[in-house]
Amino acid sequence: MKLDFPVMLAMLLLAAAIQTLLPSFHGGELALKAPLLPSVAIYYVLERQRPLGIFAALWAGILTDALGGVPPGTSSFGLLAAALLFFALRKFLPEASWLIPAAAGAIVAVFLALLQYAVLRARCGFDAPFYLLFRPLLVIVPFAAVVTMAVVAAARRIDLMAGNTEPRKEVAEP
């Protein structure tokens, strides 16, 4: 019996708990958190079946919005849009590369920060100037890349231990 959904639920809840406890990167009135929940979604989108990726993106977005104080659906929309893009590109991306999850984490972090800023500005009367977003983004982009690589490595290991995935053959056989 595969434990896909229980393992995903555990990873999402653990990521939510850790993301809540970690400090924010402040830039004036703006604060960005370490993107642990989007990193879990990126793992499922890049490495697992499509239904698991969609489910992970949806719930990572719901939890991100609930913990971050942005209008419900904002991060879910952003993560689902990113998931569809990465699903379309997945057949062209190398499987065993660490660069792909790192780049995806950085791209998704920037996309979500810009989307959340736009929604807060349009729907909630948030009036912080756009340039205040640059300093936190300069910090969060490399941090998101590293966090995503770490989360993907941990998620691969957990799924392997749970019997959800098979070991990779990353070295060509003679």
Regions found by a protein language model. Name each.
Residues M1-P174:
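Terminal, non-globular segments
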